[in-house]
Amino acid sequence: MEKKKLPFGLKNKEKLTAYNDEKIHELHRQLKAKIEAKKAKEKQDSKTKDTDKKVDQTPKVKVPFTKKFSNLWFGIDKEVNKIVWVTSKKLITIFLLIVLVSAIMIGIYFGINHLFIALGVFKGK
């Protein structure tokens, strides 16, 4: 019976179990035990991580709308005290600034309108 040729020059290798040396077998058993212990520990760690994830991913309890509304309503008094209210001086300044900007915009509009009427583009009343 002919041996099959392996592609790319691969050779048949002897397995470790083919050796009769007891020291090699003992080392092999020790390494196998260490690897199995490590895999068991990793499996246990992954289980604890999975349980931690499950605890973190617990669904939130839905609060009814009336409860949310009452919490909002009764919590407003705390929020009102936290709000920084504008001072009267700043309020007057902001109001005058808005009036000034509005007056400038109205002046520009009526100025352009009067210019068009003077040029005859629009007919006056």
UniProtKB/Swiss-Prot annotation:
InterPro entries: SecE_bac (IPR005807). The chain crosses the membrane at residues 92-112. Keywords: Membrane, Transmembrane, Transmembrane helix. Residues 36-57 are annotated as: Disordered. One of its GO terms (biological process) is protein secretion. One of its GO terms (molecular function) is protein transmembrane transporter activity. The keyword Transmembrane helix applies. Its main location: membrane. NCBIfam families: secE_bact. This is Uncharacterized protein MG055 homolog.
